[in-house]
Amino acid sequence: MRPSGRRPDQLRRIAFTCNYTKHAEGSVLVEFGDTRVICTASVEERVPPFLKGKGSGWITAEYGMLPRATHERTGREAARGKQGGRTMEIQRLIGRSLRAALNLEALGERTVTLDCDVIQADGGTRTASITGGYVALVLAVQRLLKSRKIKTNPVHGQIASVSVGICQGVPVLDLDYAEDCDAETDMNVVMNDAGAFIEIQGTAEGHAFRRDELDAMLRLAEAGIADLLLHQQEALDGCGIKS
């Protein structure tokens, strides 16, 4: 039995609150159980220097946690004067994943920045950020379409992410903090709605995992992401948007 009482193949409660903030072109509060992340998508009419004059847009991301998002207060990285390696790794992952959802040329020479701010952490903050970030990105794109800044919808694929792992010898889906701490293997998977993999990050913590265990985890991830895609669609449908 998992600490939460869930089945091995069961997601936590998933919820999206769209248009959560006032000013951003797209925003959502995403909840994976007790993990809560505010994702905002901000559009700027410029691109990084390496893309100037090339007719292509860009998607990037920043990630952070409130000091008391965790069990004990964690000092702000800004106060230390630099970002930690974990933060940089996660925000690069978010950016890479969400770039796979768009035709960047159809976006035009503009940048969309996804800010993913964890207000409460209970495992899976990066997967929640990617899954919620997609919803915020679609909302921002709809704003661009309505204002006629772009002519065609650049979104060509739906993206979601989930964690899987092996806990006490059993492959499980969507690990919370308690499971993440004790997991023998921890893996983050990003997929699109075509069933293709965008990124797989996996590490053996307690002991090496076998090929059959890897296959079992990937099957769990595929099923979990299929459910997450439906949750995303329902949230966007509630805003009158067909993703």
Swiss-Prot record:
Keywords: Nucleotidyltransferase, RNA-binding, rRNA processing, Transferase, tRNA processing, tRNA-binding. The keyword tRNA-binding applies. It catalyses: tRNA(n+1) + phosphate = tRNA(n) + a ribonucleoside 5'-diphosphate. The gene is rph. This is Ribonuclease PH. Phosphorolytic 3'-5' exoribonuclease that plays an important role in tRNA 3'-end maturation. Removes nucleotide residues following the 3'-CCA terminus of tRNAs; can also add nucleotides to the ends of RNA molecules by using nucleoside diphosphates as substrates, but this may not be physiologically important. Probably plays a role in initiation of 16S rRNA degradation (leading to ribosome degradation) during starvation. It comes from the Bacteria. GO terms for biological process: rRNA catabolic process; rRNA processing; tRNA processing. Its EC number is 2.7.7.56. HAMAP family: RNase_PH. It holds the Pfam family RNase_PH. CDD domains: RNase_PH_bact. It is an enzyme of class 2 (transferase). The keyword Membrane does not apply. It comes from Methylococcus capsulatus (strain ATCC 33009 / NCIMB 11132 / Bath). Homohexameric ring arranged as a trimer of dimers. GO terms for molecular function: 3'-5'-RNA exonuclease activity; tRNA binding; tRNA nucleotidyltransferase activity. Phosphate binds at R86, G124, T125, R126.
